[in-house]
Amino acid sequence: MPTREIRHPLIRHKLGLMRRADISTKNFRELAQEVGALLTYEATQDLPLETYEIDGWCGKVQVEKIAGKKITVVPILRAGIGMLDGVLSLIPGAKVSAVGVARNEETLEAHTYLEKLAPDINQRLALIIDPMLATGGSMVATIDLLKKAGCKEIRAMVLVAAPEGIDVVEKAHPDVQIYTASIDQRLNEHGYIVPGLGDAGDKIFGTKQKDA
């Protein structure tokens, strides 16, 4: 599936604020949650609905609810946690399935070091969240893991994506829809997205260097 770049004015505005070199941890964290929530709105807009009856103030009322599969949110640790509260603000009943993926900074290869999945994940729509889609290695490793666990429907949300990473994921898993706030220019020689956001994990957790 082709990657969807969500160019909503609110998303563009908030993402612009996140790109500032002097942004504080507090502001970066809050904006990551806000953009995560806005992307969730887009990524779930085609969920099926079913009608049921309730007792309203004026009698019986026909209302709607989401039908079919339930959702599990899959943050890729550690940076994915920064988007989690924003996503859960819209789907508070979702189960959280955490996946830890580390990238070798020399080879840029990804390896999984932790998985804590919902026990019924094979019956749920998996919504992967990670601020950055750079080389695509972490995303592919996570999707591989979820499919091995029996997931039939997987979607991914990222704040910014590099064309190189998109290409890797789309070739490895063409059935997975990616939603992003921005498709950026490229990866640099160190595997970082340009212009990107810098190291999103460091900025979310307050571990970035003063000159970062």
From Swiss-Prot:
CDD domains: PRTases_typeI
EC numbers for this chain: 2.4.2.9
Pathway: Pyrimidine metabolism; UMP biosynthesis via salvage pathway; UMP from uracil: step 1/1
GO annotation (BP), single: UMP salvage
Known regulation of activity: Allosterically activated by GTP.
Residues given in the record as 5-phospho-alpha-D-ribose 1-diphosphate binding sites: 78, 103, 130-138, 199
InterPro entries: PRibTrfase_dom, PRTase-like, Upp_B, UPRTase/APRTase, Ura_phspho_trans
Superkingdom assignment: Bacteria
Residues holding uracil: 193, 198-200
Cofactor detail note: Binds 1 Mg(2+) ion per subunit. The magnesium is bound as Mg-PRPP.
Keyword Transferase in annotation: yes
UniProt-recorded Gene Ontology molecular function terms: GTP binding; magnesium ion binding; uracil phosphoribosyltransferase activity
Keyword entries, A-Z: Allosteric enzyme, Glycosyltransferase, GTP-binding, Magnesium, Nucleotide-binding, Transferase
Cofactor requirements of the protein: Mg(2+)
Catalytic activity, as annotated: UMP + diphosphate = 5-phospho-alpha-D-ribose 1-diphosphate + uracil
Task of the protein: Catalyzes the conversion of uracil and 5-phospho-alpha-D-ribose 1-diphosphate (PRPP) to UMP and diphosphate.
HAMAP family xrefs: Upp_B (MF_01218_B)
UniProt xrefs under NCBIfam families: PRK00129.1 (NF001097), upp (TIGR01091)
UniProt family annotation: Belongs to the UPRTase family.
Name of the protein in question: Uracil phosphoribosyltransferase
Organism: Pseudomonas putida (strain W619)
